A protein has these predicted regions:
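Primarily the HKD phosphodiesterase
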Residues: 19-81
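Short, structured motif recognition centered on aromatic/hydrophobic residues
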Residues: 35, 95, 134
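A general structural motif
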Residues: 9-15, 39
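Short beta-strand scaffold segments in enzyme catalytic cores
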Residues: 94-97, 123
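Signature of lipid phosphatidyltransferase scaffolds
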Residues: 102-146
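Short gly/pro/ser/thr-enriched loop/turn and capping motifs at secondary-structure boundaries
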Residues: 63-67, 89-90, 111-112
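General small-molecule cofactor/ligand-binding pocket signal
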Residues: 8, 81-85
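Short, surface-exposed coil-to-beta transition loops
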Residues: 90-92, 117-118
Length: 146
């Protein structure tokens, strides 16, 4: 694992486990903008973080959230604030900001298929200026969809 940037891949090469570990290490805040969320382990890690007192906000693609496999309702039932983008089909981001210290991003959809079948990538970046840029983008998206 690099000091400032770490790379992970799928299928079955650590991307999902790394994302779950990233979430489990957060102690203050998690902001996530995702296209799809159907991976049970990622869902459970977000719920566990919320139960530990971590402030969790999730912005999802509206059309994907309507899938019967989507975990958005499970997050809401656990008390996590979930917004769906107002322009259905336009949210294709896949990033997470942890404790305002690191960003996880890449092509990796938060799904079982991405973990087990698809060729995907996931980066963790620990550079303050990159984290700030992602936070500004998340805050803008959150405000636009509130």
């Amino acid at each position: 694992m690099g000091k400032y940037v770490s790379t992970y891949f799928s299928p079955n090469r650590g991307a999902a486990d790394t994302l779950i570990g990233f979430i489990s290490k957060c102690s203050v805040s998690i902001d996530a903008a995702v296209y799809s969320l159907t991976h049970d382990g990622i869902r459970d890690a977000l719920i566990d973080a919320h139960r530990r007192g971590v402030a969790v906000r999730v912005l999802m693609d509206r059309l994907q959230s309507k899938s019967s496999y989507s975990d958005d309702e499970a997050l809401e039932e656990a008390g996590i604030t979930v917004l769906r983008d107002k322009k259905a089909g336009s949210m294709h981001n896949k990033f997470i900001i942890g404790d305002s210290k690191a960003v996880g991003s890449g092509s990796f959809n938060w799904s079982k298929n991405a973990d087990k079948r698809n060729a995907e990538n996931f980066l963790i970046v620990r550079l303050a200026y990159v984290v700030r840029e992602f936070q500004v983008e998340f805050d803008n998206l959150w405000e636009l969809n509130s």
